[in-house]
């Protein structure tokens, strides 16, 4: 994999760590707030799909069933945020193409990694939540 793709993948993993850790912390405080992770899917308008025409063409062929657009992904996110599903959302991962919560990667559920990232983020930003 290219360095750019690895960085992108790690950034998505860190997003999941953040959501799962935030969910745990909010539950522990009894805040009553819910947080969820949402994957908008591969979108035709993103730089990933438009930067390189040959890469975009291959991606469209390989992932045609997963391709969407901003409007479809936005509607799926709005439905989730508005609570239009008949299920709880807190601490879960949702994919635009799925009718319910999905499992994220096994690594994304590593609570130690999530906690370490949270603490490092607090240290680097000077912001504690």
Task: Place the predicted regions along the sequence by residue.
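NAD(P)H-dependent oxidoreductase Rossmann-fold/reductase module
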Residues: 1-129
